[in-house]
């Protein structure tokens, strides 16, 4: 099984422009994400799929492999699919470029189901990670930047939403709430099929690319993780990550 990590990196984010180059205690954000990806035990290669030579300019002197992709990709998965066409692999993991604190263990958790599949059996279409939320975690439950997920009895995603799901009319001791941890692993075939499909209705409504797969009948297997690392979507997130890095450097 050959697994490759692809990191989509777009320079002009709408919520935090040029965040890939934002300074995080002496290193650009994208460099820190790339360094964390290199620590995976299961991936054989890490490639950054960038839309700007400026991103390549900070990575390539460090030895990073960078593929320049079209600036017109509608989402990160389309960007990595473009890069993947020139790379031989069985599985591709989409690690968002704005995850500078991503745990290497989380990367390997998403990849492990592909390695565990018995010889000759079907591989998962796609895997991702989920993190449990408590019923009192209202800040995250109500935050549209925090994506929530509900699953079937076998751990396959039923739906992802920026809204609180499920709607809790009657609480139950067995009710479990989860947030989505935004990395995905795909077979090479499913990744290219995703990129060939048009943007779906629910994907456009929620601005969540994974809904394109669900609407087309693919299964997304959700793997539980106990490690939740903050990504960077807003200026407030950026300051939080900076403070965490400063704290870690003093430890």
UniProtKB/Swiss-Prot annotation:
Gene Ontology molecular function: 3-deoxy-manno-octulosonate cytidylyltransferase activity
One cellular-component annotation, GO: cytosol
Gene3D superfamilies to which the protein is assigned, alphabetical: Spore Coat Polysaccharide Biosynthesis Protein SpsA, Chain A (3.90.550.10)
Signal peptide coordinates: none
Alphabetic keyword roster: Cytoplasm, Lipopolysaccharide biosynthesis, Nucleotidyltransferase, Transferase
Known catalytic reactions: 3-deoxy-alpha-D-manno-oct-2-ulosonate + CTP = CMP-3-deoxy-beta-D-manno-octulosonate + diphosphate
Broadest EC class assigned to this enzyme: transferase
Recorded superkingdom: Bacteria
The protein's Enzyme Commission number: 2.7.7.38
Pathway: Nucleotide-sugar biosynthesis; CMP-3-deoxy-D-manno-octulosonate biosynthesis; CMP-3-deoxy-D-manno-octulosonate from 3-deoxy-D-manno-octulosonate and CTP: step 1/1; Bacterial outer membrane biogenesis; lipopolysaccharide biosynthesis
Gene Ontology BP terms: CMP-keto-3-deoxy-D-manno-octulosonic acid biosynthetic process; lipopolysaccharide biosynthetic process
Cellular compartment(s): Cytoplasm
InterPro entries: Cytidylyl_trans, KdsB, Nucleotide-diphossugar_trans
PANTHER family xrefs: 3-DEOXY-MANNO-OCTULOSONATE CYTIDYLYLTRANSFERASE, 3-DEOXY-MANNO-OCTULOSONATE CYTIDYLYLTRANSFERASE, MITOCHONDRIAL
Record's function text: Activates KDO (a required 8-carbon sugar) for incorporation into bacterial lipopolysaccharide in Gram-negative bacteria.
Stated family: Belongs to the KdsB family.
Name of the protein: 3-deoxy-manno-octulosonate cytidylyltransferase
Native source organism of the sequence: Chlorobium luteolum (strain DSM 273 / BCRC 81028 / 2530)
Source taxonomy: Bacteria, Pseudomonadati, Chlorobiota, Chlorobiia, Chlorobiales
Gene: kdsB
């Amino acid at each position: 099984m050959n697994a490759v990590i692809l990191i989509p990196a777009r320079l002009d984010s709408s919520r935090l422009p040029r965040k890939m180059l934002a300074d995080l205690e002496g290193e650009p954000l994208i460099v820190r994400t790339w360094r964390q990806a290199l620590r995976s035990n299961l991936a054989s290669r890490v490639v950054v799929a960038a839309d700007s030579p400026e991103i390549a300019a900070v990575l390539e002197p460090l030895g990073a492999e960078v593929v320049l992709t079209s600036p017109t990709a509608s989402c990160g998965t389309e960007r990595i699919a473009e890069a993947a066409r020139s790379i031989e692999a069985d599985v591709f993991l989409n690690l968002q470029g704005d995850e500078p604190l991503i745990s290497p263990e989380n990367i390997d958790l998403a990849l492990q189901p592909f390695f565990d599949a018995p010889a000759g059996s079907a591989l998962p279409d796609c895997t991702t990670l989920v993190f449990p939320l408590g019923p009192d975690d209202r800040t995250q439950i109500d935050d549209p930047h925090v994506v929530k997920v509900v699953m079937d009895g076998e751990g396959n995603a039923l739906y992802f939403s920026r809204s609180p799901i499920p709607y809790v009319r009657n609480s139950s001791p067995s009710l479990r709430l989860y947030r989505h941890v935004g990395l995905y692993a795909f077979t090479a075939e499913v990744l290219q099929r995703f990129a060939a499909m048009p943007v779906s209705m629910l994907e456009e409504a929620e601005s969540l690319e994974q809904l394109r797969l669900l609407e087309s009948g693919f299964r997304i297997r959700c793997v539980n993780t106990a490690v939740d690392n903050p990504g960077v979507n807003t200026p407030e997130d950026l300051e939080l990550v900076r403070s965490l890095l400063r704290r870690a450097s003093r430890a």
